[in-house]
Amino acid sequence: MKSFKWKENTEEKDDEEKTNEKEQNKPKEIDSKTEQEAKQEKVSEADNSVKDQEGITNKNRPEDISYVDDSTIQAKTALTVEAITNIKGHLIESDQKLADERASQYLQTLTNNAVRYTTTFGISEISDEILIPYYHEIDFQGSDKELPSLFSFETFVNEYYGTDLLTYENEKFKTMMCDHPALSRSSEIFKVNAYKISIKWTGETFNPSIGDPSNIGTTSLIKNIAYVGVHNSDNYKDRKLYSRLKMFLELAANCNIILKGCATRPLGIDYELTKVSKKLNGAKILYNDKAHIIYNGIYHPVTPFCDKVNDILKEGDVDIDFGKIFKYGREVVTKINTYDILNKGYAAIDQFTAYLINMGMQRLLDHRMNANSYKDLTQANYPSRVSLHVFDTLLDEFLYVYKPTDQDWEFCLFVIMIDKEVRSLIMAKTKQMMLSRNLFGQSEIGLKLTNLITRRVQGNIAKNAADYFINVMSSGSIESLCNILCSEMYARFSKFNIECSYLETEYLDLFKFLEILLAFIITPRLAWWNSHKFGKHLYDLMSVFCRSELIAYEARYGCFIKFERSAWVKVDKHVSVYGENDLYDGIYFSFLISRTYSAEEIKAFPFISKIYSLIEPLGDYINLDRKTRAKYPFFETTVRGYLPCSIISYTDITTNNPVNTRVNNIGASIIDLSQRYFTHKPTKTSTKEAYDLILDTIGNTANNLGILMHSTVAPMLATLYDTFLFFADGFNKTSPWVVPRKLGYSGYNVYADRNKSDADRATYLIGGRAIVIPRNLDSTNSMIYTYIGIFVHGVVRCDMVTSTGSYITSSHYDPDSISIMPFNGSEITTLALKVVNHSKRINTVFTLFNYLHSKSTDEILSPVRERLSKFWTTSNARALLNEITRIFNCPIERYFTQMNAYDTMHSDPRVYKPTLYSVSSTGNIDSVQPANCAVNKQYEFGDTYLNEMLKVISHVAFDDELPLFRQTEGLVCGYFTSSSNSPDDYFSVDEDTLYFSIDLDEHPEVFTTVGTNGFSIQLQFKKGNDDHAYTNPMSKDIPSIKFLINRIGNLNAHFVQFINRMLSTQRHLIVLRKVVVDYNVITLGSWNDYTPTSSNVFDQFVKDRDLINIKLDFYDTRFIIQNQSNQLLSQYLFESYRNITPLKDFVVMGGIFGNPNRAESKLTDINKDIYCFGDDNDQTTKYFTSKKSKRVV
């Protein structure tokens, strides 16, 4: 792990070394370097040896790191972030002193009954718990819980034979079991009275739990269809396929498991040794290991069983060479000093689980976070004045931190763009960071301004003006400021609503001009990209204050224009119907477009001709180098952000700055407009003078805005732009009226195939359409801009208000040093890593859905896809996606739900390899896609590690050869009795000589109909030289017949009924050669456990002649003990069916019961196909569940 030391960047000198020509507007000289700064410089020199390096090697790394101030950081401590800044003298008071003792009484009295307006930032109140980790850690520290495994042992105990294990237990072995849970688990599994030990599915050891695919439920793979006729048997097949798909998905959701804290304990065996105990004496055993048969070779009460376990180790056994490949415990892979960081463990889990854990861990090791990468990620999330230095401490903190690849960050951007909740989480963090820095305060200007207006202006006008500013003050807050700045940062994702509440008298509506025009300075993106609303408010105001000028302007230039064929042309549209879609289609208010006016035009349109010069963008772009170095995602190809104005240091700022110049121009234009307006109105001279004074006062007071924007807002935004939190811009400084195209997402290559037929389009989403990404609903009142312009101060404040303007004096500095901590960049780094890991999990969900898509040609999930392809409808696709998202706990189905133009819900998830597109306002994909941003891009779905894991999971889920799927082909129906049965017993069709065979597929003519009144069924055939014909199926004269047929559906229903009546005589059989049987093997411990059934299985085929798949139970009687008087009589199995091939069973060992020293007669052989002793293919000790190659494909 690395520790990080923060210190202030000291490359820039203090301003005391410069000659200042404007002393009256400059702060007092800041004292020379403090002692702390001197110490920091020394630390900086010492840090150069490790800066920009992976870190000191373990060989040379000191245990402690000492700093020059004699403080010591222990090398074993986890990651710490220490931020030290000494930004001198700004903020006399914090925003918490809004209603301090000097103003609170009067101000509260004024604002108590004022109408309040709020600024909302439309983000959802959500927690980062919605972000699902890509890796799932299981910590075994201090716990004896077992390791996860798909399979484990299942013990069948003969309850009718009361042998107590403890009667024969060895006391020394019992003591050893207490220290080694794996030994006690093994003894518990291989009990004295266990008649059978088999393998069972244990998917519940995972989270989420993995269901047993052999349990076929009622849910079908195909939705909303009725199974009738020849397709009726498909219902069972679809339900079986669904159960396997469900298991596949649940296992895929558990691919990335990290096992932590797995301890080992050595075995100490100090009594009579066996072959196994000699090998294991002193061996380290995993404390959390599962049961293993080999432990019973140390000691077992049933001596023959213990001997049998030891016999597998006899010298010369080529299958198992214990001394070379049988391993226990763990091997150290990575070690730091005396600490084991990474180990390779050996445990008795199945090879599939071992493979998935190892492959997931291998990805983590191949892409493990290192100190330099983490430094780049974190450095981007701190202000530029804070420099980062890296020291080497324990690496285990980084050991489990995944380092995202470039492809991961690219897809992360895609998720951020389309997922409103993830965006809201990022936006909420941005707002939190803005508020946490304590950069803004609310000044007392409101109180002074209202007092000034009241003193200098008499009558109702003064009261109305004072009421206006009271409303402005009561509605604004520092949080409202941060809300509007957040909306500005994320304007591309904001559906913004600006309310403009007009006042009781038209004279006061002049203030609305100020509000609207200030918006283009403070939030240029919001103002320009919502110019259909801001322009509408300007239009309404001009309709009042310069109506004749506006009418003449419209007559010459039109109200709306559009750029077509290299020229601006008028658009005939009424203001009342102009909206957002028109703006996106390139239709703009003509007075918002830059144009060159002649002297005659300026004279004719004195106010309107100035509008663009009053709203023209003041700022510029900044390159986001730290973001680029950190590889954080950004939508545009050129990684830069637009600032609303330039950055001017708080030590250099004066009232003569670009923003103040713009504000003064706005004030002058409004004053000029008001003068011309009052010239044509019968207004008292005192009223006009009063308004001149008010406007003059506002104009001078608003000089505060330039200081706020240049020295606080712009630097803060520049810092945030470089962080992970800022991911898209798109503002066009030269043509600000151009709104970036809306964004949507659909299948990759929909753009290229948009001209295909509707049938082809259905394989994507909706042909050439896309789902438009959702936006946040933000709203405010235009008063917020007056509030920001007058009543908010930043790192430089100005509270002096006079009738001639405001001035900055030396008193604006706090004489004491105030330290403003940078916001916690480590929190942003943590959020970034959470988001990218969450997006990687979503990528996995899309990867699986892509494999199921009808357009996919991949081998993975092909059995399911082939079945689905015939029913690839919206409802089936949606049901599948819902199932995937439920299992992965990633509700991405919301990505495919949107409101269409008619406010109705639309949802179609049939998107293959989704990507972003630029789209029209209605969601149609643009015919030309921009090349300067991340649209029409093919993402990487999955990775090499995931694809390899999915191949193994496919083997588990869909390979019918696995013993997990107890499935056999062929079934014989009739009546059978037997006194014993085992899975190896079966009815041999070819070797049977008791029945006369009739192949109905080759000789369907044996059944005919006879008779004139109605008809009868007749069975006729030739046996030897004799002809046989029967119309009575119950006739005892019919020789015992064995019918053979592939599918009963090939026969007439009446013929099938005839055969069924023949079977009821218990003298005939029918062999269904192509029927697939899913079966369970029920092992009986006593005849009391067996209950014969009276049902006839063939009845199911009579009812459904197309039935080709059925589930049945078979019995194993090998381990029945009859040691009670009521069990001494002979017992038999009575069944209406038999298997025609041997059955499979997960039998590990059987017959461990009876007198412990006389159990040879019942002991079965140890199934070596179940076990693999070693770590072939880099896997752990395990038992196999397949007779295929022990090397996982």
Swiss-Prot record:
- Provide the Gene Ontology terms for cellular component: T=2 icosahedral viral capsid; viral inner capsid
This protein's record includes keyword Electron transport: no
Query: Where in or outside the cell is it found?
Result: Virion
Q: Domain of life here?
A: Viruses
According to the record, the residues making up region (Disordered) are 1-64
Keywords assigned: Capsid protein, Inner capsid protein, T=2 icosahedral capsid protein, Virion
Question: Is ATP-binding found in the keyword set?
Answer: no
Q: Where is the composition biased (Basic and acidic residues)?
A: 1-10, 19-64
| Predominant location category | virion
Instruction: State the remark under miscellaneous.
Output: Function inferred by structural homology with BTV-fold inner capsid family.
Q: Which family does it belong to?
A: Belongs to the turreted BTV-fold inner capsid family.
Main role? Answer: Inner capsid protein that self-assembles to form an icosahedral capsid with a T=2 symmetry, which consists of 120 copies of VP2, with channels at each of its five-fold vertices. This capsid constitutes the innermost concentric layer of the viral mature particle.
The subunit field of the Swiss-Prot or TrEMBL record says: Homodecamer; each decamer is made up of two conformers of VP2, called VP2A and VP2B. 12 homodecamers assemble to form an icosahedral capsid.
Q: Tell me what this protein is called.
A: Inner capsid protein S2
Identify the gene encoding this protein: S2
